[in-house]
């Protein structure tokens, strides 16, 4: 087996490029071998793969001219319509010859091509993600020149036209920008802005200019169509972390130094706790909106699922279970108030509106653009509350089982009491719905 490799290398050393790349035997019938003739493609013998050992002394300039004369006598029948074999040999000499430098871009590339590539890379970066990284843009071979500095970005109004930040300098964020939310969550957007800059203080952030490039318009269109909760999550993250992005979790990597995964369960629960304790939702003389209550229940259920399936904390974090119990108790209280109003016959659902258009009167509910009458509204509300309550029962049972696995202590006892209390509230609300 050891002798087969040198013999195979000897057979391939004098072969043409096509036979060498395919690792097939070449009959070396210059100027065109049999396989290249069958494939109807030019048969090229590279100078770098010629037989014999490489010379001890560096080759002279005459060797390159002799190689050009040698490869210029090939059969013109086998050449491609776009160019001759002599041009291909010259290109191979420029790339594979000794002392030659491999050029990424052709010499005929102009500054206009580089500017077009910069615009394309910028649009792709803006469409694929919310942040623009200059490091990925500078890796493009068409931009690795001084012509890139002539490319001007769309600066917002009020900035100097001649000023442009260096690509290598870190971005300067003078203020925290609250992401744009759809009209349905407009009340939360105003609350987020008041939480960032003071509840009674003036709004110091200048609204971004709407006359932006087409890529920003595409992003805003995507937000309005399908990324409703993604924009809401960014707004919650802006308030929770003061606009610094996802916070680092100190206990996760310290407890699991060999784990490459990063657990964001506590981050999600901190956002949920911020929502639950928000002044807009915790008003003494009024109840929470019905659509916001349903949204919080959906968020609680998704966090339950993430915590139970998390491979980092392995569903054993008592602090996570305690936080989820507190948030779940808030949601169950809101749903039980709705069930109590339905069972007692009191029509207090005028404030539980969900929709894009205002209702005709204060006692109607809008779902999308359709206004429901009293009977249909009560039936839909009853079905929604019953479904949401029943969905949380197996989750609470799973939490009770996970709590028994943890070490006994005051926190474990508190979680057991909270789970039993939440389970009792769920059964009580379901009983009121059946009456």
UniProtKB/Swiss-Prot annotation:
Compositional bias per record (Basic residues), positions renumbered to this chain: 50-59
Gene3D superfamilies reported in the protein's UniProt record: Zn(2)-C6 fungal-type DNA-binding domain (4.10.240.10)
Role of this protein: Transcription factor that regulates the expression of the gene clusters that mediate the biosynthesis of the host-selective toxins (HSTs) ACT-toxins responsible for brown spot of tangerine disease by the tangerine pathotype which affects tangerines and mandarins. ACT-toxins consist of three moieties, 9,10-epoxy-8-hydroxy-9-methyl-decatrienoic acid (EDA), valine and a polyketide. ACT-toxin I is toxic to both citrus and pear; toxin II the 5''-deoxy derivative of ACT-toxin I, is highly toxic to pear and slightly toxic to citrus.
Signal peptide segment: none
Name of this protein: Transcription activator ACTTR
Extent of Polar residues compositional bias: 76-89
Gene this chain is encoded by: ACTTR
DNA-binding positions: 16-43
Cross-referenced PANTHER family: MONODICTYPHENONE CLUSTER TRANSCRIPTION FACTOR-RELATED, OLEATE-ACTIVATED TRANSCRIPTION FACTOR 1-RELATED
Miscellaneous note of the record: Gene clusters encoding host-selective toxins (HSTs) are localized on conditionally dispensable chromosomes (CDCs), also called supernumerary chromosomes, where they are present in multiple copies. The CDCs are not essential for saprophytic growth but controls host-selective pathogenicity.
Protein's UniProt keywords contain DNA-binding: yes
Record field: compositional bias (Basic and acidic residues): 60-74
Predominant place of localization: nucleus
Region (Disordered): 48-89
GO CC list: nucleus
UniProt entry keywords in alphabetical sequence: DNA-binding, Metal-binding, Nucleus, Transcription, Transcription regulation, Zinc
Lineage: Eukaryota, Fungi, Dikarya, Ascomycota, Pezizomycotina
Compartments where found: Nucleus
